Design a protein with these regions (language model features):
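Helix-adjacent hinge/juxtasegments
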Residues: 59-60, 71-74, 79
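Generic beta-structure capping elements
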Residues: 53, 60-64
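Core segments of cupin and vicinal oxygen chelate
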Residues: 9-55
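N-terminal beta-strand motif that seeds the catalytic metal site of vicinal oxygen chelate
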Residues: 1-16, 78-83
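A cross-kingdom feature marking solvent-exposed beta-strand/loop segments within repeated
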Residues: 67-68
Length: 87
């Protein structure tokens, strides 16, 4: 049985604008900020952790990077499931 969405990770090149949208428009609460000097891509990474109703959103911004918009005629979707046995 499905119980909840635990967390979602979103990569953005407009971190503060994205934080404002999630907090001011959607009502998420800011939980923490973090920064890693060297990410797996070899550049610094900024992280923002938000929460609403038991669901966390992790915003990630790679310093010096940009996120290109998808072409208008293209749809991109990801599906992933992680199961945890809590017996």
């Amino acid at each position: 049985m499905f119980k909840k969405i635990d967390h979602v990770e979103i990569v953005t090149d407009q971190l503060e604008r994205t934080v404002d949208f999630y907090t001011d428009v959607l009502g998420f609460k800011l939980k923490a900020r973090d920064r890693s000097d060297r990410s797996s891509l070899g550049v610094p990474l900024q992280l923002v952790y938000l929460e609403l109703g038991g669901t966390s959103v992790e915003l990630m911004a790679y310093e010096g990077g940009s996120v290109a918009p998808a072409p208008a005629d293209e749809h991109l979707g990801y599906r992933m499931m992680a199961l945890e046995d809590r017996r």
